[in-house]
Amino acid sequence: MGQKVNPIGLRLGINRNWESRWFPKFETMPANVAEDDKIRKYVKKELYYAGIAQTVVERTAKKVRVTVVAARPGIIIGKKGADVEKLKDALSKLVGKEIAVNIKEERKPQISAQLSAENVAQQLERRVAFRRAMKRVMQNALKGGAKGIKVSVSGRLGGAEMARTEWYLEGRVPLHTLRARIDYGFAEAHTTYGCIGIKVWIFKGEVLAKGIPTEKAEETTSKPKRRPAKKRGK
């Protein structure tokens, strides 16, 4: 089951938080979901080259707060924050509500699955060989501190007449382990031969029940001392 299901959805409430954080009435829920989808699609389309890793939408009774996590926040902010105000006005006009926009920097873009998938897609659109693009992203992720990474590409690879799927795996990616912090990303590359889909899974380590990474837990727990062996009498 872990091989088939989306690893983010499988771990919601365990070691992953929701990207839409609000509690509406039943009647307003469909409209809120549609608004969230509009906001995310607009941000992804207009700010694609800023490297959008995540878009979190939080709601109160009257306000909507959008937090954009980007690898290159300077592109979004602009000179003296002028572009942020434009984005804020555009989103407010799109949704018809007052919107507050926060910009956060993705400090480790190498181990963001979404950014890695988009990186492969951009390379394929520049006609880089798909195996080289996959290997390059995998090397960067492992250098950035990932414990394991799996990259899958599917479509008319290399311009072949028949579509196929190829994937590479480095390190460990335990999809069935719920305490494992696994990030997942998907992107599409629009090439002259058609559309190629890219999926990326990145394993960032395991988390215990208290939210402590297993590496730190092993350091803090002291090893039990061995008792000295008893001397046998002659």
UniProtKB/Swiss-Prot annotation:
The keyword Ribosomal protein applies. Residues 213-234 are annotated as: Disordered. GO terms for biological process: translation. InterPro entries: KH_dom (IPR004087), KH_dom-like_a/b (IPR015946), KH_dom_type_2 (IPR004044), KH_sf_prok-type (IPR009019), Ribosomal_S3_C_sf (IPR036419), Ribosomal_uS3_bac-typ (IPR005704), Ribosomal_uS3_C (IPR001351), Ribosomal_uS3_CS (IPR018280). Part of the 30S ribosomal subunit. Forms a tight complex with proteins S10 and S14. Belongs to the universal ribosomal protein uS3 family. This is Small ribosomal subunit protein uS3.
